[in-house]
Amino acid sequence: MMAIISSQNSPPERSRPPSVLSNQPTPEEQHSLAEDSLRPHSLQDYIGQQELKEVLHIAIQAAKARQEPLDHLLLYGPPGLGKTTIALILAAEMGVNCKVTSAPALERPRDIVGLLVNLQAGDILFIDEIHRLSRMTEELLYPAMEDFYLDLTVGKQQTARPRRLKLNRFTLVGATTRAGALTSPLRDRFGLVQRLRFYHPEELQQIVQRGAALLQTPITPEAALEIGRRSRGTPRIALRLLKRVRDYAAVKHDGRITLDVARAALELLHVDPAGLDGSDRRLLRVMIESYQGGPVGIETLAAATGEDVQTIEEVYEPYLLQMGYLQRTPRGRVATPRAWQHLGYTAPENQLPGLSSPYDTLS
């Protein structure tokens, strides 16, 4: 595939600031040294995702034994589960550099070309939201991933000439929340495809305790578990809540995070014991009060709540589905009896059977 390198600017996208329970990183978290300090830097320190860790450990040891770069890796799952962290850990374990970018930042061919030609042998290129790559950028990646070269067209019109650039062997780590949105040619070029799952409260408890130790904040095991239970199965949210509870403990108490302190701080943040915030409860309440629990079409639900469809599908729905508060049907979304009960309503008999939480057996 030949790509013409040209210059074309587009206005940046505008986005709403995430809430305390958003699984998207805030701008401060994206550039925070404190956030980096809380990341694990080795597979041994990485908590949870045991099957994934075993697969990656084998891949790392095999690549080192053959003195080859790692195979290309696709990570998929809800936001905030540690995809970027895994890419950085792989680079540390392999002793190479890791370049981090995202698909929206690679709109023009020269953007991806500039990254690829500057990679050293064995380096890792991490592309977040890889399902959003433009068609031209994606097609540039095909020969780069398979044969480590780029076919370019340099110049314009009569002065245009083809040029093939050889690349150093590298590892592409792609991350996506929508694996089904990837084209088959791109997905098939990844040698490893791994799914990240939501974390159990006990795993999040360990993450919170580790984070508190790094932040030099005393915390009881019960308080760490309480924060973990309200973190929507997501480490990013658990660490964000830890920081807010730490602030509360420092201002309102003696700096120690006990169970009572954690509960008081989380109530102040409107995070309920199930990990739902005001936006989640509003979404479910609209379905119950305005549409008798559903089914409700996603477009209708977005209009009624003032949220866009993508936010509902990628931010709210994964956790509500996982915890059994929401059900997708061919006719639309349905609030389950579990959601009715959580909000203090009595579900009608014709509603879907109640769904249990995957964490019920763990509490």
Curated annotation (Swiss-Prot):
Domain of life: Bacteria
Region of interest (Head domain (RuvB-H)), residue spans: 273-363
Region ranges (Small ATPAse domain (RuvB-S)): 200-270
GO CC, one annotated term: cytoplasm
Function recorded in the entry: The RuvA-RuvB-RuvC complex processes Holliday junction (HJ) DNA during genetic recombination and DNA repair, while the RuvA-RuvB complex plays an important role in the rescue of blocked DNA replication forks via replication fork reversal (RFR). RuvA specifically binds to HJ cruciform DNA, conferring on it an open structure. The RuvB hexamer acts as an ATP-dependent pump, pulling dsDNA into and through the RuvAB complex. RuvB forms 2 homohexamers on either side of HJ DNA bound by 1 or 2 RuvA tetramers; 4 subunits per hexamer contact DNA at a time.
InterPro entries: AAA+_ATPase, AAA_lid_4, DNA_helicase_Holl-junc_RuvB, P-loop_NTPase, RuvB-like_N, RuvB_C, WH-like_DNA-bd_sf, WH_DNA-bd_sf
Broad class of enzyme this protein falls into: hydrolase
CDD domains in UniProt: AAA
SMART domains per UniProt: AAA
Region Large ATPase domain (RuvB-L), residue ranges: 14-199
Protein name: Holliday junction branch migration complex subunit RuvB
Binding residues annotated for ATP, in chain numbering: L38, R39, G80, K83, T84, T85, E146, D147, F148, R189, Y199, R236
